[in-house]
Amino acid sequence: MMGVTLTKFNEVYLRIKCEPSVARELSEFFTFEVPNAKFMPSVRNRLWDGKIRLFSPGTGKIYLGLLPYVRKFLAEQGHKIQYDSSLIPPPKFDKKITAKFVRSLEKGKLKVRDYQIDAIHTVLESGRGLILSPTGSGKSFIIYALVRYYLKTLNDKKILIIVPTTNLVEQMYGDFADYGWFPDEHCHKLYAGSDKNTTKEVVISTWQSIYKLDKKYFSQFGAVFVDECHLAKAKSLTGIMTKLLDCQYRIGTTGTLDGSEIHQLVLEGLFAKHKEVTTTAKLVKEKYLSNLHIHCLVLSHVTKNRHQRKYPEEMDYLSKSPARNNFICKLALTLDGNTLILAQYIKQLETLNLALTDHTKDRKIFFVYGATEATERDKIRGIVEEENDAIIVASYGVFSMGINIKRLHNIIFASPYKSQVKVLQSIGRGLRLTKDKTECNLFDIADDLCYNNKSNYTLKHFEERILIYSQQEFDYEIIPVKLKS
């Protein structure tokens, strides 16, 4: 019986040489159904079976980051494994050296935390990493420390940092300056309209700015960082990662995975097996983040508005409901401190913004959505940091990812969501700690539209959010509210 030979094909793929029967076993093991694929037009039209196959029997290739899973599967099936010399693990890295290097970067008020050193050490040991660390844990410092290290070890190669939005390009650049570095000397900001070529060693870019470029462009990079890398499941970002054929150091950071097995395995394949550095609950307990209080307000709608609806119809009703929107406005106006209202649909955001503006003259109301320019968003952020009772009406897409306002005292979920990524990122917006802000209140608006003893769609989504809160060890209370017509 022929054994199985594992070879590093390049920095993206592992090649598995084995008998056809073993290849079929591997193909079956690494084939997964995409969640909710049955609703996709390509599946409904029978153009695709809704499955993702991570191993190709034809080429024998699989993402290099999945090596631990390949090794475990083959061993459990009793196959003898031979490793090519390209897969010999690097020598152990002394953690004392890591700690000494990281501590040398401390300047001013910056104090490095132990879990940050652990995360940095994990990456330096293997050259790859998928760092799972929540909002407020200092992911940007972890990236910064690794950038500083790799600048010393990469001779003629540059470093690529990929972020989801132009706002986060500016934020990362600003964070590096806050850490006492000189990004204007070392970093090139790349987004719409920017020159794609530079002599600087570090390129900070949105994925939209570079995903169409060819492999030749990406050959200049020896290290890549992808911040908020849960977006790497998007085809464009996966395309970027697979063009970095000879990029040795590959690091992804994210606040959360979305809970699906295929999502996790794709990310781990592109980077490495994930390491959870810390949790929001631990950061709150250790006083690195504000105390979180979750108030789940379950609105009981009047009988005449309860009838069977399809999901889009239910969402449309909730976003347009005058009684519901009026309740949200009144709630926001009774809260002390800066308040963020998050909603999904622009029409609802516009309605809430107009109603709030009409009902108050002595509080600043800001409206932020996808069309709001990055410079305007940054201007709003600066104003709110100096305010005590501002109200921001914003879309989930914009504010759940990357606008960093520390002085947020209250968050209102005005639209029902069940995405673990969006929920946790949105909560993270309010957990930043400041001298005069140690508490954050989340008001999760849920809707009881049960009809004929059958739960409505968004009430089921609320149950999903409760599950997330429980898994994250958040304290929450459920308060029933009768909604007047």
Language-model segments: what does each one mean?
Residues 51, 84-132:
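Conserved pre-motif I regulatory segment
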Residues 429-463:
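Conserved segment of the helicase C-terminal RecA-like domain
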